[in-house]
Amino acid sequence: MLAVFQAWAYGVILYLIYLLLIWLWKEKIDTVLVGLFFGTLTAAQFIANKLVDYGIGVAPAGTVIFMTNVAVLDAMAIFYGRQFAMRAVRLGFFFQAAVAFAAWAAAQLPPPAWFAERAAVVDSVIAPSARIALASLAAYLISSTVDVYIVTKWPRLHILARVYSSSLISQVVDTAVFISLAFGPEAQIILGQILVKWAQIPLEALLIYGVRRYVSTLRTK
């Protein structure tokens, strides 16, 4: 269970860094959010190669930063609209595909003889199998679309009700699609990853309220 609390601590630190960036460039919050969206998406993709036992389930090490990516997407959808968020999602899909291809291409290049052993280790980290890469892309596109739809569907609901419900549902979709396509429908693995992701969802309030504060200030000027 200690790993869960460590993950919360890391999540809080990440959100504080994001809020600092938003404060520094508060006149360009939409640009900052887009940058954070693509940055966290890429980081999560590479960190995902390490698996962590969180006590409540086993999930990739990139789960923490991936959940901050979900929060950033929610913030874009809530404060800048569904179309804005979906443009980011579609661009993110092609961006992820390009990164996966670049990683695969890099793994095909021949290393010098003295680096061959280390290169094999590096290749195993940066270049996922075609099946895992395709599963990741499918899970991302489907779950992100579901997330944006839900968080913008009922604007009269309390902001946290929208954020938490969209994240809860979209992460079930994300995990089920990815695990089923990449490894087969392993219920135990799916449940473990869902629980780890759900444990991070309450922290999304830090980013959502932080962004709302600065967006509201800008709109009243």
Sequence positions of predicted segments:
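Internal alpha-helical transmembrane segments of multi-pass membrane proteins
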Residues: 128-133, 153-172, 218-221
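Short alpha-helical transmembrane interface motifs in multi-pass membrane proteins
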Residues: 54-58, 130-136, 161-162, 189-192
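Transmembrane alpha-helical segments of multi-pass membrane transport proteins and ion-pumping complexes
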Residues: 15, 45-46, 70, 74, ...
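Membrane-interface interhelical connector segments
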Residues: 105-130
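Transmembrane alpha-helix boundary signature
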Residues: 46-56, 79, 101-114
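Membrane-interface alpha-helices at helix entry/exit sites of multi-pass transporters
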Residues: 83-91, 161-164
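Alpha-helical transmembrane segments and their cytosolic interface
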Residues: 1-10, 18, 161, 170-221
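Hydrophobic transmembrane alpha-helices
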Residues: 1-76
